């Protein structure tokens, strides 16, 4: 499921693979109203993961800590993986996020759930125009979790090992 607006290539990748997806525009569901939208989609039981950009590309807004907490709570309630696209990591210039290991820190759903994958772009951070360099960070709990569907399709392993050795490789 896509929390829009988002990066259109992500939907294109899903379409190329022939999968269905759901999406909604977050502008209509800011703050506590986000819970309603997530509940509507996730309660059907057919969503395995959700993705959003924060700071957002292309609209350049940021989800609040309250909204990230709601996303984390819903991910826990419905056992859904949150893919957090942090392509513009630490580029919320309303506060100084430029000192590593010192507060304030990048806002992240990782504070509220263990069902997360963070995707961080080195290309943006190091201004490598055209080059694609990135980091994927998976929570320890999710990394070591086994899913019957992945075992059936890929022949075993934890989520993390399948992600690294089958999906990315």
Each model region followed by its residue ranges:
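Conserved PLP-anchoring active-site segment centered on the Schiff-base-forming lysine
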Residues: 1-11
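Hydrophobic residues in well-ordered beta-strands that form the structural core
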Residues: 2, 23, 82-84
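A short helix->loop->beta-strand "cap" motif at the edges of active sites that frequently abuts
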Residues: 19, 77-80, 114
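Active-site phosphate-binding strand-loop segment of PLP-dependent enzymes
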Residues: 27-97
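Aromatic/hydrophobic pocket-lining residues that form π-stacking "cages" and hydrophobic walls in ligand
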Residues: 71, 104-106
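Conserved core segment of the aminotransferase class I/II
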Residues: 111-169
